Amino acid sequence: MQAMLPVILILLLPCIALASTATRATPEQLRKCKFQQPWSFLDCYHEKSDFPTYWIVIVGIINILSCTFFSITIYPTFNFGWNSPNALGYPQEPDEHIPLQHIQQPLALVEYENEPQPSLPPAISYFNLTGGDD
C-alpha cells in the first residue's frame, strides 16, 4: 500500500503542473457564481467556464480507475462472506469434561403417541348429497 502512494503522486504531477501554468483568473472572475445567490444561478450556469471540460472527464476516469484498483487490492484482506464460506463452520463436538451418560435427553412435554386420536369425519360423496349423478 505504501508503494502505491509514490505512483499516485507521480501520476498527479502533470495535473498539478498544468494547473499552475494556466493563466490565473482574478478573484472577481472567480466569484461570478455565488452559492448564496440562487436567483442568479441560471445566468451564471449558462456562462462558459474557463476550465476545460476534458479535464473533468480525465479526473473522472482517474477516479474510477484508482477506486477500482484500490478495491481489487484490498479485496483479499476481507475474510468473511463468500471469501471464506467455512469461517463459522466449527466442528460440533461435545466437551471432553462432560461424560456422555450425564447428558440429559430432552423431555417430551406432550407425548402425542399416547394420546387418543380423534376419529376422522365420514366421507360423504357429492353424489349422495344431491341424490344422483347430476
From Swiss-Prot:
Subcellular location: Host membrane
One Gene Ontology CC term in the entry: host cell membrane
Family label: Belongs to the adenoviridae E3_14 family.
Keywords linked to the UniProt accession: Early protein, Glycoprotein, Host membrane, Membrane, Phosphoprotein, Signal, Transmembrane, Transmembrane helix
Native source organism of the sequence: Human adenovirus B serotype 7
Pfam families hit by this protein: Adeno_E3_14_5 (PF04834)
Entry comment on modification after translation: Phosphorylated on serine; O-glycosylated, but not N-glycosylated.
InterPro entries: Adeno_E3_14_5
Record's bilayer topology term: Single-pass membrane protein
One biological process term in Gene Ontology: regulation of signal transduction
Residue intervals passing through the bilayer: 54-78
Signal peptide range: 1-19
Protein name: Early E3B 14.9 kDa protein
Known function: Down-regulates the EGF receptor and prevents cytolysis by TNF.
